[in-house]
Amino acid sequence: IFSGGSYGASAQTATAVVNMQNTDITVDRNGSLALGLWALSGGRITGDSLAITGAAGARGIYAMTNSQIDLTSDLVIDMSTPDQMAIATQHDDGYAASRINASGRMLINGSVLSKGGLINLDMHPGSVWTGSSLSDNVNGGKLDVTMNNSVWNVTSNSNLDTLALSHSTVDFASHT
């Protein structure tokens, strides 16, 4: 899927469900906001073996207004730089926290931001994340990361709620 702006795939209502498997998504802003996967208004996206490539200023995976995104197997998110938004939730008054769950081998170049949402990353062996993290704990939101035989190259100041490591490395030297 190639998106020259807006989004690659989106679930925009409470009855909307998008199921994807073995899919590559490339997002180019063309001057406006662009998102690889976008769930909102109670929409739900499930994905298995996805690759998302985002141009500068794009967002990889984004959930808002009580929506949910569940991803399994291999997940590649390659933003233009590690400070770009790879995975994020957004708080909106009057809505329950949105949820993003990912479990599998992950290659992430970009940051993970839990802003009023719940993000759970279960990184299987061979996973590499280069970027930063933020959890603002608004609306009951949190960011939990489990890493097994994986590497996180921390590129800037970061915080999260839970970090469980098994034979994994958190490389603070990547922060410049």
Show where each model-derived region lies:
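Long, low-complexity, polar and repeat-rich extracellular regions
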Residues: 1-176
